[in-house]
Amino acid sequence: MEASLLKKNQSIELTIEDLTHDGSGVGKIDGYPLFIPNTLPGEKVTAKIIKLNKNYGFARMENIETVSADRVEPPCAVYSKCGGCSLQHLSYDGQLEFKRNQVEETMKRIGKLNVEVPETLGMENPWRYRNKSQVPVGFVNGKLTAGFYQKRSHAIIDMSTCLIHNEQGDFAVQKTREILAKYGTEPYDEQTGKGDIRHIMTRFAHTTGQLMIVLVTTKERMPFKEEIVRELVEQLELTSIVQNINPHKTNVIFGDRTKTLWGKDIIEDTIHGIRFAISARSFYQVNPIQTEVLYQQAIDAAELTGEETVIDAYCGIGSISLCLAKKAKHVYGVEIVDQAIQDARANAELNELANTTFETGKAEEVIPAWYKAGIVADVLVVDPPRKGCDEKLLETILAMKPKKVVYVSCNPGTLARDMKILTDGGYVAKKVQPVDMFPMTTHIEAVTVLHLN
């Protein structure tokens, strides 16, 4: 069939050739690509066209004529509606291979790099891994509910469990929901801006078993607040109950004010033997098992002997910095979020690591200032946000010439782009190691080390 003859709502038969970065299947009609969610390579499907653009279109799978050997039955009852996961229909081995292929293809296409991409480091059990649940609250069929948003919408799906949240946090969300409903707590309405409760968040410390509940409310006063707190304490094994107040008409989750309603201000967890104090708003990796795997890759890549000066750009609460400080002469960390730097300093003190310096600011401004002041890194670690490293920071790296750059990435596209700039500037990379931090989703983390040639 010619692509020019395709029409909206038309049913067509085609074979899926590949998966996109967001996990949709891709099939072609006369060279014209159609993106079809919930399909896998090798599958012959019947699909209904829902949108046609000039160079590509979208279709909805109606029937699978030939089923992929990698297809599995998703165990989650709301998987087809929920926006939380996108790969439950693909076997876990298939997910790991998909992520490896994504990294390899991105390195070649964007970075023009021919590097080794080994098998993705996955989990023994890829379920129940998230130590943080962040669940919106709303009305569904006239009753208070807590669940995830539907795909491409802000409609909340009523759900009794989430299979990627750890059991303790998951149970705490459901119990909190029951108690709020019992006291007639009114959920926040995005349209009107009215209501009392916006989100229920839980944080669970994997190594200590400590559990925090955060109630995100529209105002400090909430009907029956004392009774709700008392019942939570009676019915759950908790370390902390915290209230965050967000009075703004926005879809941003947190407001600026946080107060402890019961118990401690923080919970405590460990990574590679380093203790971390985690507050309601601390940035902290959500998969504790794979964080150890990811950081071990970074530690191994740094090859520290105790004589090195290390700079950690985008250091957050110091999680990588402090793991490296055990083996370095001195570690300097920089982070734009001041609260994270305060947390990093507190965590350094908690672990009696005096060989650390943390400063608030933009990495691309602070590191050049350090360089001018004579602070030169032997090893420079970057763990940037999805947008990758700032251009000015990359220029500083090329001027400073650290022997090694250890790059921890949450976006293969910007990793490939930045690696190309560094390799063009005299660095050599041999391997990029994917790590599966978020099973059942398309997110990919990767670690590489670039050596000065």
From Swiss-Prot:
S-adenosyl-L-methionine binds at residues 285, 314, 335, 383. It is an enzyme of class 2 (transferase). InterPro entries: MeTrfase_TrmA_AS (IPR030390), MeTrfase_TrmA_CS (IPR030391), NA-bd_OB-fold (IPR012340), SAM-dependent_MTases_sf (IPR029063), TRAM_dom (IPR002792), U5_MeTrfase_fam (IPR010280). GO terms for biological process: rRNA base methylation. GO terms for molecular function: 4 iron, 4 sulfur cluster binding; metal ion binding; rRNA (uridine-C5-)-methyltransferase activity. [4Fe-4S] cluster binds at residues 76, 82, 85, 162. Its EC number is 2.1.1.-. Belongs to the class I-like SAM-binding methyltransferase superfamily. RNA M5U methyltransferase family. This is Uncharacterized RNA methyltransferase LMOf2365_1776. It comes from Listeria monocytogenes serotype 4b (strain F2365). The lineage of its organism: Bacteria, Bacillati, Bacillota, Bacilli, Bacillales.
